[in-house]
Amino acid sequence: MAIVKCKPTSPGRRHLVKVVNKELHTGKPYAPLLDTKSKSGGRNNNGRITVRHIGGGHKQHYRIVDFKRLKDGIPAKVERLEYDPNRSANIALVLYADGERRYILAPKGLSAGDSILSGVGAPIKPGNTMPLRNIPLGSVIHAIELKPGKGAQIARAAGTYAQLVAKDGAYVTLRLRSGEMRKIESDCRATLGEIGNSEHMLRSLGKAGASRWRGVRPTVRGVAMNPVDHPHGGGEGKTSGGRHPVSPWGVPTKGYKTRSNKRTDKFIVRRRAK
């Protein structure tokens, strides 16, 4: 994997920095594990915008990724690594000994031809999945469940991981990348290693059009709007907004805490770093 900074042969390539991975499959994805993906433009069932800055973009297929890894005791061989337009991480197509193929998140260091295994008796090596109670202290893990059997929800993006720092009865304590220390049931599953494609954060798209290809629309500043559109809007000439920064709905931004899920506060040992 290499970081390539393009020469300024055009305005769009002047700031283009891309990640080149020659291990990625260049052909078509595995068709039985594809699903249709319709665009919403950020609108809900009433046609109202619920998520801003979404719309357009290239048509994509959804890759059905196995986040549960429940095929215990059946070894699988990595056939190839693939690009996935739906996430920052790459995915791996694996062939199980019983003939079934599945997509999984590709951890760092996994290559075509490697073998992986799920279950209690799996060896301690990247790509293998097992319950948290069977993972040694200090291990780096990813694709972590929050509830047993629900599927991975934590540490799924490129370059992310968590560290297992303590075990206490029915719970284990994890240190997340944000600095948060959190308790999770020890029956939840996780995969060893960190997610690959960590260079993803170093890329630069180079031009606005590259964001539009990905379905991302422009972000307009509130002070550039009219008063009907934003609390910072209006005024004669350029203004500072006239108040502390807020969202379009008047909620303070820039560090204002909005977490309201008190029910799960008991699982958070230490809040994330600011």
UniProtKB/Swiss-Prot annotation:
Cellular component, GO, one term: large ribosomal subunit
Database matches in SMART domains: Ribosomal_L2, Ribosomal_L2_C
Quaternary structure and interacting proteins, as annotated: Part of the 50S ribosomal subunit. Forms a bridge to the 30S subunit in the 70S ribosome.
Taxonomic superkingdom: Bacteria
NCBIfam families assigned to the protein according to its UniProt record, in alphabetical order: rplB_bact
Annotated GO biological process: cytoplasmic translation
Annotated protein name in UniProt: Large ribosomal subunit protein uL2
Keywords: Ribonucleoprotein, Ribosomal protein, RNA-binding, rRNA-binding
Entry-linked InterPro entries: NA-bd_OB-fold, Rib_uL2_dom2, Ribosomal_uL2, Ribosomal_uL2_bac/org-type, Ribosomal_uL2_C, Ribosomal_uL2_CS, Ribosomal_uL2_dom3, Ribosomal_uL2_RNA-bd_dom
Keyword Ribosomal protein part of the UniProt annotation: yes
Region (Disordered): 223-274
Main function: One of the primary rRNA binding proteins. Required for association of the 30S and 50S subunits to form the 70S ribosome, for tRNA binding and peptide bond formation. It has been suggested to have peptidyltransferase activity; this is somewhat controversial. Makes several contacts with the 16S rRNA in the 70S ribosome.
Annotated Gene3D superfamilies: 2.30.30.30, Nucleic acid-binding proteins (2.40.50.140), Ribosomal protein L2, domain 3 (4.10.950.10)
UniProt keyword annotation of rRNA-binding present: yes
GO MF terms held by the record: rRNA binding; structural constituent of ribosome; transferase activity
Protein family membership: Belongs to the universal ribosomal protein uL2 family.
SUPFAM superfamilies associated with the record: Nucleic acid-binding proteins, Translation proteins SH3-like domain
